[in-house]
């Protein structure tokens, strides 16, 4: 009997993009269901994630798996026949988990990114600077490698790449530029975009810009 896999997501969510990429990389057949998380969350979402009521939600044979980092690891372990996301070496595995945690620690990258379009003045300048510093730290870890894990697209790449689709929006509304200080990271993003899984999961950047304009209007941000 084939496994039933459903992914509840919201197209602009970089967290949902992660889970979709992981499923695509493993070749898992799944049903994607778009959620209206702003206006009308579905009964299934509220049933499967009653604590946080957030996406993404991965439903495997009727059982929910929550939080994107956990979902990626779950997918890696359940569909373990090919293309492991995490290294087998314990130390390298620990390093990958550390950098994934760094990206999501207190949602620092997400929060800084949000501030680039939701704040003004000195707060905006500080957010832009902090955002670039986080990216430069990640770029330093990437080094000369094609991917964070070396020659192979893996866990940290999946965790980070969703933010890449938001870079144009961050730059437009924050009035700053990422590429001059993060050339290697931008090249990494373009490399990842050549993968079918990533190209399928990430939305068009101009669509993200339009979505941010809607958010600014919704929240009364000039």
Curated annotation (Swiss-Prot):
Its EC number is 2.5.1.18. One of its GO terms (biological process) is glutathione metabolic process. GO terms for molecular function: glutathione transferase activity. It holds the Pfam family GST_C. One of its GO terms (cellular component) is cytosol. Residues 89-211 form the GST C-terminal domain. InterPro entries: Glutathione-S-Trfase_C-like (IPR010987), Glutathione-S-Trfase_C_sf (IPR036282), Glutathione_S-Trfase_N (IPR004045), GST_C (IPR004046), GST_C_Tau (IPR045074), Omega/Tau-like (IPR045073), Thioredoxin-like_sf (IPR036249). Residues 3-83 form the GST N-terminal domain. The keyword Transferase applies. Glutathione binds at residues 13-14, 40-41, 54-55, 67-68. Gene3D superfamilies: 1.20.1050.10, Glutaredoxin. It is an enzyme of class 2 (transferase). The keyword Cytoplasm applies. It catalyses: RX + glutathione = an S-substituted glutathione + a halide anion + H(+). Belongs to the GST superfamily. Tau family. May be involved in the conjugation of reduced glutathione to a wide number of exogenous and endogenous hydrophobic electrophiles and have a detoxification role against certain herbicides. This is Glutathione S-transferase U21. The gene is GSTU21.
